[in-house]
Curated annotation (Swiss-Prot):
Functional description taken from the UniProt entry: Exhibits phospholipase B (PLB), lysophospholipase (LPL) and lysophospholipase/transacylase (LPTA) activities.
Glycosylation sites: 50, 56, 122, 231, 246, 272, 314, 343, 387, 433, 481, 501, 528, 553, 572, 594, 606
Protein name: Phospholipase B
Species, as recorded: Cryptococcus neoformans var. grubii serotype A (strain H99 / ATCC 208821 / CBS 10515 / FGSC 9487)
Gene3D superfamilies per UniProt: Cytosolic phospholipase A2 catalytic domain
Residues in PLA2c domain copies: 46-572
GO MF, any single term: lysophospholipase activity
pH effect on activity, per entry: Active only at acidic pHs.
InterPro entries the UniProt entry points to: Acyl_Trfase/lysoPLipase, LysoPLipase_cat_dom
Subcellular compartments: Secreted; Cell membrane
Record-level GO BP terms: glycerophospholipid catabolic process
């Protein structure tokens, strides 16, 4: 990094890390900026008289979401009929409500998750030949978290293009996410200009603003990237993306979690923390609180940032706070997790330097995302956040719920089936072990204590049970005969053709590597076209709830599928051996059950360690980047 760039980086990040926002936005500069609709910063508008500023979660779906899902259902129904007919299966008596959920895990999760999505797209020749392509057109909801939120943002904002096309024609993920290869001073100048404009209006800024703008400049449409007009809001997506305007894509949901501070000053991200969701229509939560849960509420996301007291605006209204890049950055605020990454570094000097930097950020709350609290003084008798100025949000994966299942488990949404793509870093070799599902199951038991806050999560095994049963190496159906919950089709990342166990903190990918990640993610869903019965069984699982099937009345074909792919309720809690799958191999369970054909034998050596080597390199890359960032902040040992 050049001296000039480092100096400017210092100015930028020092401003962000140590700025203290005023209690309410300043508006004296607004006249100079006009509407500001080409800027990252929010802009002032007249307060509308026909807006419901706070909607209690117990009232069901918001009007915008309800209208979208109704329009979506009309498009989904003929797709379901066509896909079922192609498998020789009966058309369900009602249209199933299907969701997909993409886990967190940085670029690894974005690429692997979008690969899984590609496995459901007819536009992919390989997915079409594997006979799972086409099902995405039958999906109503799409939820993303952290790296999965990047997948959500790039896919939705680009109108649902094939991910390999986005890689070839748009993404520049071969350039480091925070420290671009070209090292242009303009990158930092633009970051400073955009974030400073937001700060000048009195809104809180933090590293999340910079993080989000950087993400957007790598994966959002070029016209909305930092060097052009970084002003794409979440609420504007249905009006600027025709495929969302006419409900041709699933409705997107991005989630984050709140962070609390204990009396002793310890920063806490609890597994039972409030889960917040962003949609093109609303921001809010279905359940407020951590230790005690009460019914949550929602506010129109278009006016997020407006100061509201007990359901009424305080005279000044704002638009533009819901920048899509900011929402994506909020869902992927990984800085707390960086502490975990430091434990494996070899340099004590490096560790001390970055730890000091992160500790300062944590103390000043610059490593979280601050949202002006629209729910201030609302329902103060039951609302645990009624007296907060800001809602403080972090990466929801830090609750260990690294798959955004909860929004799709809410009874009001009536979701029938969820395809859950898991790219979590759970094991020593950066593969999933079911922690995300198990954590959500345990959380669901707490939420079920109150009727108005419950979510409908089927039972799943322990983490040891996932590994010992091989459930973390191939798709598994959960909740097969529990018709009170959605059926979950769990799709873990597995090295079918590539060592996809790269580090969460790998901030750049060469295009060839990214392409292999996408293809491997697709094959984790299609099973590399190696199991002839899989497309039929996948169809059975997606539509089962709409038939109200159980083992007593399910069709012979689908029951045979469920006998094969459903979790049988076993849970071997014995400590498993180290999980280290072999690249280019078939999951042992598929071989043992004589399900797979036409796949080459695994190589003699375990090449998945290449992924570990890649993770080590990634760790070095991000460490050097953090050193430069810390140096820019002028931190000294």
């Amino acid at each position: 990094m050049s001296i000039a760039t480092a100096t400017f980086a210092f100015s930028l990040f020092a401003t962000i890390a140590f700025a203290v926002p005023p209690e309410t936005p300043r508006i004296e500069l607004q006249a100079e900026r006009g509407l500001g609709d080409k800027s990252y910063a929010p802009w002032q508008v007249d307060c509308p008289s026909n807006v419901t500023w706070i909607r209690n979660a117990t009232t069901g779906l918001g009007s915008g979401e309800r209208a979208y899902i109704e329009a979506r259902e009309k498009l989904v129904q003929p797709v379901i009929e066509q896909m079922m007919a192609a498998r020789g299966l009966e058309t369900p008596p009602r249209t199933p409500n299907i969701g997909v959920a993409l886990s967190g895990g940085g670029y690894r999760a974005m690429l692997t998750g979008l690969g899984g999505i590609m496995g459901m797209m007819n536009e992919s020749t390989e997915a079409s030949e594997s006979e799972t392509g086409g099902w995405l057109d039958g999906v109503s909801y799409w939820a993303g978290l952290s790296g999965g939120s990047w997948a959500t943002g790039t896919f939705m904002s680009n109108g649902g293009q094939l991910p390999t096309n986005l890689l070839e024609n748009l993404w520049n993920i071969d350039s480091n996410l925070v420290f671009p290869d070209d090292d242009k001073l303009s990158f930092y100048t633009e970051l400073y200009t955009e974030t400073n404009a937001k700060s000048d209006l009195g809104f809180p800024i933090q590293i999340t603003d910079v993080w989000g703008l950087a993400i957007g400049s790598h994966v959002l449409p070029e016209r909305y990237q930092l060097s052009n007009t970084p002003n794409l809001t979440f609420s504007s997506l249905p009006s600027v993306v025709s495929a969302l305007g006419n409900a041709s894509l699933p409705m997107p949901i991005i989630i984050a979690a709140d962070r609390k501070r204990r009396e002793a000053g310890e920063l806490v991200i609890a597994e039972n923390a409030t889960v917040w969701e962003f949609t093109p229509y609303e921001f809010g939560s279905w359940a407020f609180g951590s230790q005690y849960k009460s019914p949550g509420a929602f506010t129109p996301i278009e006016y997020l940032g407006t100061s509201v007291d007990d359901g009424s605006p305080n005279g000044t209204c704002w638009k533009g706070f819901d920048q899509l890049s900011f929402v994506m950055g909020t869902s992927a605020t990984l800085f707390n997790g960086a502490f975990l990454e430091l434990n494996g570094t070899d340099s004590g000097l490096l560790t001390n330097l970055i730890t000091a930097f992160l500790a300062d950020l944590g103390e000043d709350q610059a490593d979280i995302s601050r949202i002006p609290n629209t729910f201030s003084n609302y329902n103060s008798g039951e609302n645990p956040i009624y007296n907060l100025t800001y809602i403080t949000l972090v990466d929801a994966g830090e609750t260990n719920q690294n798959i955004p299942l909860e929004p799709l488990l809410v009874p009001t949404r009536d979701v029938d089936a969820i395809v859950a793509f898991d790219s979590s870093y759970d094991t020593d070799y950066i593969w999933p072990n079911g922690t995300a599902l198990r954590t959500t199951y345990e959380r669901a038991k707490v939420l079920a204590e109150h009727e108005n806050t419950r979510v409908l999560m089927p039972e799943v095994p322990s983490m040891n049970g996932f590994v010992n049963g091989g459930y973390n190496s191939r798709p598994t159906f959960f909740g097969c005969n529990d018709t009170t919950t959605p059926l979950i089709i769990y799709v873990p990342s597995y090295p079918w053709s590539f060592a996809a166990n790269t580090s969460t903190y790998q901030l750049s990918y060469e295009n060839d590597e990214a392409n292999e990640m996408l293809l491997n993610g697709m094959r984790s869903l299609t099973l590399n076209h190696s199991v002839p019965t899989w497309p039929t069984c996948f169809a059975c699982a997606l539509t089962d709830r709409s038939f109200m099937y159980t083992s007593e009345n399910r069709s012979t074909t689908c029951q045979k599928c469920f006998d094969t792919w459903c979790w049988a309720g076993d849970d071997n809690t014995t400590e498993p051996a180290t999980y280290e799958p072999v690249i280019n191999s078939v999951p042992p369970w598929l071989v043992a059950n004589n399900l797979s054909i036409g796949v080459a034998d695994a190589p003699a050596s375990n090449e998945s360690t290449a992924g570990t080597a890649s993770s080590g390199a990634a760790k070095a890359d991000v460490s050097m980047g953090m050193v430069a960032l810390a140096a820019g902040l002028g931190l000294m040992l």
